[in-house]
A protein has these predicted regions:
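Conserved, non-catalytic sequence blocks in retroelement Pol enzymes and Pol-derived host proteins
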Residues: 6, 37-43, 62-66, 83, ...
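Amphipathic alpha-helical transducer elements in NTP-driven molecular machines
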Residues: 13, 26, 43, 47, ...
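RNase H-like nuclease fold core
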Residues: 1-7, 52-139, 144, 148, ...
Length: 308
C-alpha cells in the first residue's frame, strides 16, 4: 500500500476503480485518494478513469454463452437514477446461471423500468442470440408476464417461482410476533416430500392462520402451478433451486452501492458500478456447487437428451 504523502501513484487507477465498485461517488473517491496519497484528483479524472472499463462492459454483455444451462435465476435490485433533474426508480435485472460444470455465472445485467412481457421477451431472446439454446429451469419472482414469455422463448423450460421471495412476500402480511412461527409453518410446505404432502400442509397452514392473516396465503394458491415443480426433485436439486446464496451474495454487494450513494448520476454510472461490483464478487466463485455431480446426474435422468 502507498503510504500517505508518497508520490508513487502506480496502481492508483485500479484503486479508483476498486473504490467505485464499492459504491463510492466520484467526490468520495477524490477525497479518499487525497487522504491516502496526499494529492488531489479531480472528479473529472475519476470519472474518466471509471469510464475506461466501458468497452469491457460492452464485450461482457455481448460475449457468447453456453448452449445449455441447467438452472437460471432472474433477480431484480432497485436503484435511484437522476435524469434531467428528475429522480427515476430503475431496476437492475440480474441473470444468474448455474453451468453444466456446476459453476455460478452472471450472464447479463439489464437496467430498465419496464417489466412488461415485451421487455422480458427481449431479455430472453438476447440470451438466445448469444448462443443459449436450452434452459431446464428458470427461477424468478413474480415478474409481470414472465410465464408466457418463458413459454414463448424456451418452450421446454420449467418456470419455478423463487421460494425465498414467495416466503418473504407472505411474511409481509404477518405481524412481527408471529413471523418466526409462521415461517416455520411455511417450511412444512416447501420441504414436503411430495406435492400431495405439500398441498396437505398448505391447507393446514392456511386454516391455522387465516383468521389472523386472511390474505397471507392467497398467493400460494394463485402461484401453485409455478411453485409446485420443485416437489419432483430430490433434496440436493431443491437446495440448488431454493437456496439463493449466490443471489444473496450479489445482492449484498449491490446493496452496498445503495448505501454509499442514494442516487446515481446516470444509467451509465449505475451500469459501471454494477459491472465492477459483479466482477469483484464473482472473482471468488471458483468452485462448483456442493454435490453438483449428484444434482447433474438427477437432472440428466429427469431431462433426457437435453444436457448432452
Amino acid at each position: 500500500m502507498v503510504k500517505k504523502r508518497q508520490k508513487d501513484i502506480s496502481g492508483i487507477e485500479q484503486k479508483i476503480i476498486s473504490l467505485y465498485a464499492k459504491g463510492m461517488t466520484t467526490r468520495q473517491i477524490s477525497d479518499t485518494i487525497e487522504e491516502i496519497y496526499g494529492f488531489e484528483v479531480s472528479d473529472g479524472m475519476v470519472s474518466d478513469i471509471t469510464d475506461r472499463p466501458l468497452p469491457q462492459i460492452e464485450d461482457w454483455q455481448n460475449r457468447p454463452l453456453d448452449e445449455v444451462y441447467p438452472i437460471v435465476f432472474i433477480d431484480a435490485v432497485h436503484f435511484s437514477v437522476r435524469d434531467n433533474g428528475q429522480i427515476r426508480k430503475l431496476a437492475a435485472y440480474v441473470i444468474l446461471a448455474v453451468s453444466l460444470t456446476g459453476h455460478k455465472e452472471v450472464l447479463s445485467i439489464h437496467i430498465g423500468e419496464d417489466e412488461s412481457a415485451k421487455y422480458w421477451l427481449g431479455v430472453l431472446n438476447e440470451l438466445k442470440n448469444r448462443g443459449v439454446k436450452d434452459v431446464l429451469v428458470i427461477c424468478a419472482d413474480g415478474l409481470s408476464g414472465i410465464k408466457e414469455v418463458v413459454n414463448a422463448a424456451f418452450p421446454q423450460t420449467e418456470l419455478q417461482r423463487c421460494i425465498v421471495y414467495q416466503v418473504r412476500n407472505t411474511l409481509k402480511y404477518v405481524g412481527a410476533k408471529n413471523k418466526k412461527e409462521f415461517a416455520n409453518d411455511l417450511k412444512t410446505i416447501y420441504h414436503a416430500p411430495s406435492e400431495e404432502a405439500a398441498l396437505k400442509q398448505l391447507e393446514r397452514v392456511t386454516e391455522k392462520w387465516e383468521k389472523d392473516y386472511p390474505n397471507a396465503m392467497k398467493s400460494w394458491y394463485k402461484n401453485w402451478d409455478v411453485i409446485s415443480p420443485i416437489f419432483k426433485f430430490s433434496a440436493d436439486v431443491r437446495k440448488v433451486i431454493y437456496t439463493t446464496n449466490a443471489i444473496e451474495s450479489l445482492n449484498s454487494g449491490y446493496r452496498r452501492l445503495n448505501k454509499q450513494r442514494s442516487v446515481f448520476t446516470s444509467d451509465t454510472a449505475l451500469l459501471k458500478a454494477l459491472y465492477l461490483a459483479t466482477h469483484e464478487i464473482t472473482k471468488k466463485w471458483t468452485m462448483p456447487l456442493r454435490n453438483w455431480g449428484r444434482v447433474l446426474g438427477e437432472l440428466e435422468i429427469m431431462y433426457p437428451d437435453r444436457l448432452s
